[in-house]
């Protein structure tokens, strides 16, 4: 089972806020090791899929054979990869979500992606790193784990006997194959994350 902290939005400075165990709204008064009062946690669902399977088919026409194999999984949830860390450098690749982050006052009404905290904010707000760690493990960072994936697709051609006999071969075929070429369906929140 997956549990998350309840995200309550961004404050006027773009800092994430959460439901604390005592029922208050907070950015930094979050106890990650709480074992008694867990009323501030949200049950997201199972982490293991409840339905899994595959579907395959072979299509033949003249000398061509098309083989498709798909896998599917449904009924679970996944936590999105963390997007905030304690620091960034010029070499750090920024997540896509940062393009939609809080930049100016009022942005808290259009986005749920927090501001990248400045050095001043980190110095002025005690334990601000807690808010960003909590954001990474909040309910807004959870997606459905359902997917349908094209696992394998291949196209082969069996050359006719008239060609193979001239080459003194009993058979000749040419095959093109791709493994894991694309997802047919997954939650949009995943943005390519497996």
Name every feature range the model reports, one short phrase each.
Residues 63-67, 162-163:
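Repeated loop/turn-to-beta-strand initiation elements of outer-membrane beta-barrel proteins
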Residues 107, 115-117, 186-194:
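Solvent-exposed, glycine/polar-rich loop segments of beta-barrel outer-membrane systems
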Residues 61-63, 72-76, 152, 159, ...:
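Transmembrane beta-strands of outer-membrane beta-barrel pores
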Residues 1-46, 87, 98-112:
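Conserved small-residue
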Residues 75-173:
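Extracytoplasmic gating/loop element in the C-terminal half of outer-membrane beta-barrel translocons
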Residues 34-43, 95, 133-141, 194:
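Extracytoplasmic loops and strand-loop junctions of Gram-negative outer membrane beta-barrel proteins
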Residues 68, 174-176:
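Membrane-embedded beta-strand positions of outer-membrane beta-barrel proteins
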Residues 51-57, 64, 150-155:
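Hydrophobic, lipid-facing positions within transmembrane beta-strands of outer-membrane proteins
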């Amino acid at each position: 089972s997956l549990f998350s902290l309840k995200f309550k939005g961004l404050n006027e400075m773009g800092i994430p806020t959460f439901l604390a165990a005592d029922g208050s709204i907070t950015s930094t008064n979050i106890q990650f090791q709480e074992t008694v009062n867990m009323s501030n946690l949200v049950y997201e669902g199972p982490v293991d899929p409840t339905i899994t399977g595959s579907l395959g088919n072979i299509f033949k026409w003249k000398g061509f054979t098309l083989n498709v194999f798909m896998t599917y999984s449904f009924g679970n949830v996944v936590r999105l990869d963390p997007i905030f860390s304690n620091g960034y450098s010029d070499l750090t690749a920024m997540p896509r979500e940062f393009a939609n982050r809080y930049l100016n006052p009022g942005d808290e009404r259009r986005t749920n992606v927090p501001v990248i905290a400045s050095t001043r904010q980190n110095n002025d707000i005690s334990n601000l790193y807690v808010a960003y760690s909590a954001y990474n493990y909040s309910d807004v960072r959870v997606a459905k784990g359902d997917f349908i994936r094209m696992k394998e697709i291949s196209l082969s051609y069996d050359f006719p006997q008239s060609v193979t006999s001239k080459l003194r071969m009993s058979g000749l075929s040419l095959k093109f194959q791709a493994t894991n070429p694309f997802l047919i369906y997954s939650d949009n929140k995943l943005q390519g994350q497996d």
